[in-house]
């Protein structure tokens, strides 16, 4: 065989071998065993504080429900009935929207709202803050219609709707803004009949004038409610670390603090204050966003609380302040839980959230959960409307003309030392005044200035 032929054959073999090796390199896929470090470095299971999930319709809901019937007012105090009403509303089909605010002057609006002077009786769903229209659009079966961006703090549902298409109303009481919404509901008649049949057993309320400008719905007689005692369960710092940091493996603890666990990854900072029972997670070098509408902030916060598993108790959206800080309060028996000003249980009883565009700027919350089962209950009597009015007229800590809301609440009362997990939930009247939530108790008579309260 000639030398040239031998060279050609060898060259061909080398080319084939090279192609085989190249193909092997390009198609090779490593088979890491389960639990290997390589797999863990590329895919991290997202941890949550609590596995419980919560829909937007469970986070944004009315604080109170009242029936207004020819000048009489009744509070819907049956939790099962409340749930029946609120869970059915998302199934109502919205057929049309119309602004009818111009139909009423100031006196006519009040008569229409409260069912006075021949106006039809209505069910009133009251929210603790104004809710943007795009949130209602998300909650209900609502087609994409053009509308002016507005917010509402009431849904009114008339009792005497007999047509197939019913009328309900989104109302901003302070602005006297009324949006008439035409809906179709298969269960409307059953719900409204059930309410009407139970109305006589509901506690009766009246409008009480407090200060020189406003009226508030308060009970005609003292109310009997349950005082409850709970053993709180502390949530471990490591649980917050795993849920809140994007990469917990690079987080380091700062040991220069007493009775506090402070952790950072260089960008974010987690501060767990054990004596104050408070957790704060902050992002550094970010500026608070002021460009978002309230509806967007509620949706972003809902997603963040869902993604981090923040539903350690049943939290509901409560309000948003002028700094665009959103507050979510624990609700027990559909009643908000606030902190006592005289004997507070830690520094906060709410989750607060602030945003810097698409990044969380600040997340603050309690480091414990209450649970749902009290270890002890006992009956207690709550002031009637006349007593509430008299107490507020005697106190000098707050200007009664600055009161925005008065509502039922549970206040968290510390029963002993800072380390004791026992806490008492005491029924109390509360007011929103000067942007703060303040319990209405006889402690007000001993205050000289309006420096206490929960923002």
From Swiss-Prot:
Membrane topology type: Single-pass membrane protein
Superkingdom field: Bacteria
Topological domain ranges for the Extracellular compartment: 29-455
Knockout mutant characteristics: No cellular levels increase of either WalK or WalR. Induction of WalR-dependent gene expression. Cell wall defect.
CDD domains listed in its UniProt record: YycH_N_like
Keywords from the named record: Calcium, Cell membrane, Membrane, Metal-binding, Transmembrane, Transmembrane helix
Entry function: Together with YycI, regulates the activity of the two-component system WalR/WalK.
All ranges on the Cytoplasmic side of the membrane: 1-7
Subunit-level organization: Homodimer. Interacts with WalK and YycI.
Gene: yycH
Gene Ontology CC entries for this record: plasma membrane
Name of this protein: Two-component system WalR/WalK regulatory protein YycH
Major subcellular location class: membrane
């Amino acid at each position: 065989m000639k030398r040239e032929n031998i060279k050609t054959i060898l060259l061909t073999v080398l080319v084939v071998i090279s192609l085989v090796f190249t193909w092997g390199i390009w198609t090779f896929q490593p088979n890491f065993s389960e639990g290997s470090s390589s797999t863990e470095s590329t895919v991290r299971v997202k941890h949550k504080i609590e596995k419980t999930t919560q829909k937007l319709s469970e986070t944004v809901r009315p604080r109170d429900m009242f029936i207004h019937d020819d000048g009489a007012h009744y509070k819907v105090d049956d939790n099962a009935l409340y749930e029946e009403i609120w869970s059915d509303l998302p199934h109502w089909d919205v057929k049309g929207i119309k602004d009818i605010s111009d139909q009423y002057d100031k006196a006519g609006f009040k008569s229409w709202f409260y069912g006075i002077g021949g106006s039809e009786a209505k069910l009133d769903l009251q929210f603790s803050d104004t809710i943007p229209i795009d949130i209602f659009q998300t909650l209900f079966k609502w087609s994409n219609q053009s509308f002016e961006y507005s917010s509402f703090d009431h849904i009114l549902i008339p009792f005497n709707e007999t047509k197939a298409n019913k009328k309900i109303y989104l109302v901003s009481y302070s602005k006297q803004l009324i949006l008439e919404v035409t809906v179709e509901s298969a269960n409307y008649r059953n719900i409204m009949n059930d309410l009407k049949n139970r109305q006589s057993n509901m506690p009766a309320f009246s409008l009480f004038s407090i200060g020189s400008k406003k009226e508030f719905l308060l009970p005609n007689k003292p109310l009997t409610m349950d005082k409850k005692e709970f053993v709180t369960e502390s949530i471990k710092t490591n649980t917050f670390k795993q849920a809140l940091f994007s990469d917990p493996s690079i987080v380091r603890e700062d040991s220069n603090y007493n009775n506090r666990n402070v952790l950072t990854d260089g960008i974010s900072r987690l501060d767990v204050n054990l004596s104050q029972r408070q957790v704060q997670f902050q992002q550094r070098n970010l500026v608070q966003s002021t460009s978002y509408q309230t509806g967007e902030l509620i949706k972003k916060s809902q997603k963040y609380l869902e993604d981090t598993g923040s539903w350690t108790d049943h939290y509901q959206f409560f309000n948003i302040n002028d700094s665009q800080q959103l507050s979510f309060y624990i609700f027990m028996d559909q009643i908000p839980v606030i902190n006592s000003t005289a004997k507070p249980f830690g520094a906060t009883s709410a989750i607060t959230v602030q945003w810097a565009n698409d990044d969380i700027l600040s997340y603050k919350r309690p480091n414990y959960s209450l649970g749902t089962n009290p270890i002890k209950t006992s009956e207690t009597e709550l002031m009637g409307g006349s007593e509430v009015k008299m107490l507020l007229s005697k106190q000098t800590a707050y200007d009664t003309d600055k009161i925005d809301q008065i509502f039922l609440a549970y206040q968290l009362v510390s029963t002993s030392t800072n380390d004791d997990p026992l806490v008492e939930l005491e029924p109390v009247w509360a007011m929103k005044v000067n942007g703060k939530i303040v319990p209405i108790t006889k402690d007000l008579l001993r205050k000289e200035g309006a420096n206490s309260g929960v923002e």
